[in-house]
A protein has these predicted regions:
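Terminal domain-start leader segments
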Residues: 1-254
Length: 254
């Protein structure tokens, strides 16, 4: 892991970045992530399901909760990464740690797809004390992860309505009725479990979690599904077309 940190810091130095935040997350804020988004595990060697890694120029630390204290101590031993035990009085907040280890005017980076707006606001407020800048548009880990697993592409299938309880048409109609009541023209869905429910869509992108990585925009006449289209089975395609759901590539949401 020390060699990985050296490589990562080299990439950070190229962009004049003083600190890098690597959460355990994906663009959908999923609790358990697929291997493509397991960047924190790749860099730290810690395999627990929850944790945030911060890499600074001369130090690094990983925050995790009480479920993983013993595991993290073992897996981080000799890595050059300090363990920060969430909930302990002596454990600083992530943003406070960064402020303490950065000089005024330096830059803090993170993959903006993986951080919620609320968390970004918390960081921004704390960073004002030293006028730290935030960089959100570079995936630094991707630069050094030469054998990074590909995005999942498991075949999709429709969950039978006798188990789902309602058809896609019925669910869309209910949501559109709520949108009309709220005078909303569009509803953006980023949570993959919500999309799985709405479209009765299932896949095997994440172990033990039968979902597909996708985005969805619902409008008053139908919607748009953003997903790797090559993985859609014919039954799913026919269902979506029938319900006026356009299909576009996953990255097209941006």
């Amino acid at each position: 892991m020390k060699e990985t940190l050296i490589q990562l810091r080299h990439e950070m130095e190229k962009e004049n970045v003083a600190a890098l935040i690597i959460p355990t997350s994906d663009p959908h804020s999923t609790e358990y992530v697929c291997e493509h988004f397991a960047a924190r595990k790749f860099v730290s060697g810690f395999t627990g399901s929850a944790g945030v890694l911060v890499v600074c120029k001369d130090c690094a630390a990983l925050w995790t909760d009480g479920r993983y204290f013993l595991q993290a101590e073992s897996q981080l031993a000799g890595s050059g990464i300090d363990l920060m035990k969430i909930g302990q009085a002596e454990t600083p907040a992530i943003e406070d740690y960064i402020v303490d280890h950065c000089q005024a005017g330096e830059t803090v980076a993170f993959d903006g797809r993986l951080i919620t707006v609320n968390q970004a606001d918390t960081y921004a407020e704390a960073f004002e004390a030293k006028q730290l800048h935030m960089m959100t548009d570079i995936d630094f880990v991707d630069r050094i992860w030469t054998d990074r697993p590909a995005m999942p592409d498991s075949q999709t299938f429709l969950y039978d309505v006798k188990y789902a309880g309602k058809s896609v048409a019925d669910k869309l109609a209910e949501i559109q009725a709520c949108m009309n009541k709220a005078e909303a023209d569009h509803l953006i869905l980023t949570k993959i479990d919500e999309i799985a429910w709405l479209l009765n869509l299932r896949a095997k992108d994440i172990p033990y979690y039968p979902v597909a990585l996708a985005y969805m925009i619902v409008h008053r006449e139908g919607g748009t599904l953003y997903i790797n289209q090559a993985r859609l089975d014919e039954e799913s395609r026919a269902c979506f077309e029938k319900n006026h759901i356009e299909m576009k590539d996953y990255e097209a949401i941006y």
